[in-house]
Amino acid sequence: SATGCGQMTFNQKLAGHWVSGSCESAGSGSYIKRDFTLTESTWKLNATVYNDAACTVKFLGLDIAGPYTVVQESTAVAGATEVNYQVTDRRLIPLSDGAVQLLMQGKCGAGPWAVNQIADIALTGCAPLGFPSNAQCPGGELDLNQIDGNNLFFGDRSADLCKARPTKLGAYPVTRAQ
């Protein structure tokens, strides 16, 4: 429901379907396309990681979901809002032999890994990819969001979001899908 004077809450503004406008650099020679679905209380991310800048060679799929809580307006970034994203579901889908080989290198899921086989990593995390287990990040990810027209920005991903909230926004927004 709306707040006084017909103003929408930040949760209401977040609710919707948001997608990458293009192939985004994810660092280390990998690229990503993100697809978020948010309600007024839950979030879901379906992401695909690619090996090429045109996003044609699939490497890995990632599905993450859970509830979220709007905390307050950011004191570090003007116009942004602090949001905590809890993770209840975290699944990986290796989409290439290279992804299978990477996932077999360290503690990542219960294994064994196979191309196109979904594996839940919520309990184990995935050290080779830098994903904590749910127990290692009990408060969820401490993030920032800013809505600018039809663009939704998240916080910069360079820090450990289990321990510290970003102090700047990421370079790539997702766009509200119609």
What residue ranges belong to the model's regions?
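Contiguous, well-ordered beta-strand patches that form the walls/edges
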Residues: 20-29, 44-178
